[in-house]
Structure formats: C-alpha cells, structure tokens
Amino acid sequence: MPSEILVKILSYLDAVTLVCIGCVSRRFYHLADDNLIWVRKYAAAFRSKRSRWKATSVEETATSLSLLSVWDKEDGYWKKEYITKQISSVRAALTNSLSPVKRRTSLPSKTKESLRISGLGWTIILREASGKEHIMQHSNLSVNDNSVTVFWHDKNWPHVDTLSTLDLYGATPIFMEQYKGPNTSCPRWLSLIEKYDLSNLRKSAMIGCDRHVRVFCVNPGLLVGLWQENGGLAFVMANIHSHGLFERSIMGSDTIPYTLPPDTTFVDNYPDSMTFYGDKGFQLHIDIHGSKTYFLCSTFHNLFCRRAGINNGYVKFLMINLKNNREHLPLVGKVGLEWRTDCLNGRIESCIVVDMTLLDEDKKPIWYVSSPVCLRSACLPDFPQPAYSFEYMDSVGGVCADLGWFENTDEYFIVRLDIYLSVAKLQQWFGRQ
C-alpha cells in the first residue's frame, strides 16, 4: 500500500496506538513519526485552556501557515514534543497527589492510591558482560508502611555468571489515563533509581539461606536469591524507602537518577553543655518485617546527640539499653524473610528487612533506609539467653541491635539498639561547619 494512504489511515489513530504501531516494523516506525499527524495531536491535546472561543478565519489562516513550518523539522520532532509534554503533565499530576503525609513519619500517606492511579511499576535491566540486555517488569510488590518491596522472578533468567550490572528503574505509563494497571503492556518511560554491580555477586555477603536458595545482599537494599541446586538466579527483591519514592521513580532519566534537593536548616550555635544540634530532639521510626509480615513498628521520641557521643565521625543515639528491661521490645510472630518464585516459596529465618526513618526537630527526614539484614549469633555478657545481632552501616548512618531469644514465650526481644549518624551529615543538614 502506498505510504501516502498509510499515513492518511494512521492520522485517524489515537496517540497511544500510534506509538505502539511504530514498534511493528521499520517502515511503520517512520510513517508513525509523521510531523503533520503529531503537530495536530499536540495542538488538540495541549491547547491552552484560555482559548475557548471559536477560531476566526484569520486565526485559521495563521494556523494553516504555521503548519507549513512543520516540514522544516526533522521526522519525529513533534512526536518527541508530544511525548515530552505528556510526561511533564503526568509528573505534575503525580506530584500533586503526594502532598498528604503521615503525621507520625512525615512520609506520603497515599502510596497505595498513587500507585493505583499512576500505574507506576519497576523494571530491572540485567546486562551481560557482552552487552546483551534482559529487561524484566516486576512480578509483584508489597506496599509497606514506610517502604515498597518489589519482586522479580522468572523461569528464564540469564546465567548469573554472565551478568555484569543490574539497573533498577521506575517505569511509568506515558498515557496514564488509558493504562492504570502496573502490569499492563503500554508505552512507559524509565527513571533510573540505582545501579548495582553483579560481577562479583558470589563474593557479596550471603545473609541467609534455606534448603532451596541462598540470598546475597547488594547495597543499597537489593537482595538476590540463587538456587542451591545449580547456582542460577531464583529471584530479585528490591527494598525502596518511601521518602522520595515517587520522585526517584518518575523524575529521573534512563541514564541519570533523580537527586532529592538538599534541605538545610540553619540553627544558632549551642554551647558544649547543651545538645549538639537542635533543642526539640530527633525522632526515629523503625519497622522490622519479612517483606510482608510485620514483627515490629516502634517510634522513639526526643532523641538527643551530644558532643561526648561522637566517635569515628559518627554520633551515637542510644535507643534501647541492655540493662533496662522496661525498654526491651518484642518481635511479634515467626521471624524471617518470605520469598517466592513461579514454582516455589519459602522463608529464610536468619534474614529480616529493617526500615528506618530519622526525623529532625521539624519532622523532616534527615536519614532513611530500607535494607535486608542478617541475624547472626552473638555473645552478650551477663545475658543468659541465646543472643543474636544485626547491623547496617552506610556513609550517612547505621544501626546496631542485639536480640535475645526467650524460649518460654518463643519470642525475640530487642535488648539493645543503637543508631549512628555521621557528623558530616549533621553539619551539612544544619548548615554547620
């Protein structure tokens, strides 16, 4: 069929169908890029809301003359302009939906609703050393109070020894109003969240296993499961904290991640006898879960850091004291990390996920993390019960905790909990030197 007739037919299609039909073949790709088609769709879709009067003959003549300049642009110019404008409108709509926050944690309160409305999903691109790419949309996810846990599992994974990197992206439908389901096949744009190096995965810290899989943690927040039988990929799990979740998932590009703008609070100098920073105290919210099942949700108020508590560039917050039984907190339920694939599922008893949000005196998140951690045997002096510990540390902050196992109640209790925050982060946050 002549190209002129095909272009005429394509002009009657909506924008979504046009984008999809451009993926059929090279010929349709070029035909679906026709500038005249897209400039008309652009004018119809993004016409100024103030221009509601009927066009006069003079305006119609001016419009027809402006269409003549369409041919001065390269093929696909107006298609790119249309999609860029559409992405901007979707970003604006999603940003407006995130304004309500929880009073307790200052994190978005309508995460589930925003996910449902936007159709936002997450995609990983596995790259082999040869350059070959494997693109996978998420299989399922769990929306937690302060984080999102995203799962990928498949029967046809590439061999783990051939992989060099894993890139995590937010994937948002370009035409949000037509496609609201996260698993719907539709045109999406990608926002890079994090890059992970998988070239030495087996040398990474193994944080748990059961009879089917071994799990390895790749910071920040990525868990990779390998089959015990053949060492192949079983599943991938990513833990993404809710603070800045949507911004990082929709505002970046496919090559550059979005960086949250710095939020500095300037305070007066305090003498050494008073608190190091702030006069109202920090607040910590901590959740411990197994990707779906919660074991602990707790908030600590009025936390202060003093100059005497600085060691190795970190300030220490003492949350729970081993010697004070009244401060000890139980983990409710059977502790462990749940995992699943297309054919099997299980639970790794030595692995849990910790979500932490440290707020300053104005309830702004100063440090936040969502990461799997490993429960390891520990020895606590003057503590008769079996003891375990877990820890997490990055350049900004960290956590160290000791747990006791009480056989009479079949429960873990957190008997010591310390939080660390870098002095450099505090100085940057409060504008101090």
From Swiss-Prot:
Location of the F-box domain: 1-41
UniProt xrefs under InterPro entries: F-box-like_dom_sf (IPR036047), F-box_dom (IPR001810)
Pfam families for the chain: F-box-like (PF12937)
Any one GO cellular component localisation term in the record: SCF ubiquitin ligase complex
Record keyword Mitochondrion present: no
Tissue: Expressed in testis.
SUPFAM superfamilies associated with the record: F-box domain
Gene3D superfamilies: 1.20.1280.50
Matches recorded under SMART domains: FBOX (SM00256)
Keywords: Ubl conjugation pathway
Keyword Acetylation: no
Highest taxon, organism lineage: Eukaryota
Function of the protein: Substrate-recognition component of the SCF (SKP1-CUL1-F-box protein)-type E3 ubiquitin ligase complex.
Subunit comment: Directly interacts with SKP1 and CUL1.
Protein name: F-box only protein 15
Species per Swiss-Prot/TrEMBL record: Mus musculus (Mouse)
Gene of this entry: Fbxo15
